[in-house]
């Protein structure tokens, strides 16, 4: 029989598998993205084509595979612009909390708590390239080589160590008050 692609069904299939357009805030041009469990990754026409062709290999339908392999127009930007534009709320640090992203979970850090959160429960999106390439593991022991190093460069002075820890925390934290932008300058004695 004749193979006919229903454009709307093809669009729905791609969106059901996480492919969308995204227009960055203040931008005029969109990019293609793939969303998986609140993680967003840039994608391209080539990666979308590879996804479709690999899917067709898995379902073992070479007739449709050959059709798509020949019909490059389905993977051009002009055709893929049919994808819906996704409205994205990115998780951001607040005055009272910061987030770090690991391979196995996100971690919400507040003054008195470190809380692992599954990405699906995060309540917003995260760029996949913001993920630290290791798994998060909660540690009961708070001593480590880095903490010893910071204490040593502060001459084991508790007050200086707290100041250095506060400075490092300030620089790592994503929330900034734009009316307060101090320069951090370190010098030795």
Segments from the language model and where they lie:
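Intein modules and their embedded homing endonuclease domains
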Residues: 1-124
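P-loop NTPase catalytic core of nucleic-acid-dependent motor ATPases
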Residues: 20-37, 41-46, 106-189
């Amino acid at each position: 029989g004749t193979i006919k692609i229903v454009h709307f069904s093809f669009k729905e299939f791609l969106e059901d598998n996480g492919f969308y357009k995204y227009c960055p805030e203040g931008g005029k041009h969109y990019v293609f993205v793939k969303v998986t469990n609140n993680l967003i990754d840039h994608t391209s026409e080539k990666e979308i084509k590879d996804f479709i062709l690999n899917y067709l290999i898995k379902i073992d339908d070479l007739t449709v595979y050959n059709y798509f392999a020949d019909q490059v127009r389905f993977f051009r930007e002009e055709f893929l612009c049919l994808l819906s534009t996704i409205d994205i709320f990115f998780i951001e640090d607040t005055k009272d909390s910061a987030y770090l992203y690991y391979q196995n979970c996100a971690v919400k850090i507040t003054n008195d708590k470190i809380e692992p959160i599954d990405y699906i429960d995060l309540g917003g999106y995260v760029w996949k390239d913001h993920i630290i390439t290791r798994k998060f593991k909660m540690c009961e022991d708070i001593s480590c080589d880095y903490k010893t190093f910071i204490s040593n460069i502060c001459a084991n002075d508790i007050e200086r160590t707290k100041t250095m820890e506060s400075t490092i925390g300030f620089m790592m934290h994503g929330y900034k008050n734009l009316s307060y932008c101090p320069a951090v300058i370190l010098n030795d004695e």
